[in-house]
Amino acid sequence: MTDFTPDAILDATGLNCPEPVMMLHQHVRNLAAGGLLKVIATDPSTRRDIPKFCNFLGHELLQQQEDAGTFLYWIRKKAD
């Protein structure tokens, strides 16, 4: 468990690739620089796709967890 308090939450449960990352892109766009987004997903491909997304665009993946088929990610948006 983390002590991160997100500024926004993206619930992508039940969605499959590429929808979670497409929604993530839109949510990050709407987040203020330095803002924290929590992503909840059930698609196992997010374990690969979300870290790559963050790395490619320069956002910080602070933590990721898996619990009974649910994947949780805490992403800090890069500064402008």
From Swiss-Prot:
GO biological process: tRNA wobble position uridine thiolation
Gene Ontology terms for molecular function: sulfur carrier activity
Main subcellular location of this protein, as a coarse class: cytoplasm
Subcellular location, record wording: Cytoplasm
InterPro entries per the UniProt record, alphabetical: Sulphur_carrier_TusA, TusA-like, TusA-like_sf
Listed GO CC annotations: cytoplasm
Residue numbers annotated as active site: 17 (cysteine persulfide intermediate)
One Pfam family hit: TusA
Protein name per its UniProtKB record: Sulfur carrier protein TusA
Family membership noted in the UniProt record: Belongs to the sulfur carrier protein TusA family.
Job description of the protein: Sulfur carrier protein which probably makes part of a sulfur-relay system.
Keyword set, alphabetical order: Cytoplasm
Listed SUPFAM superfamilies: SirA-like
Gene name in the database record: tusA
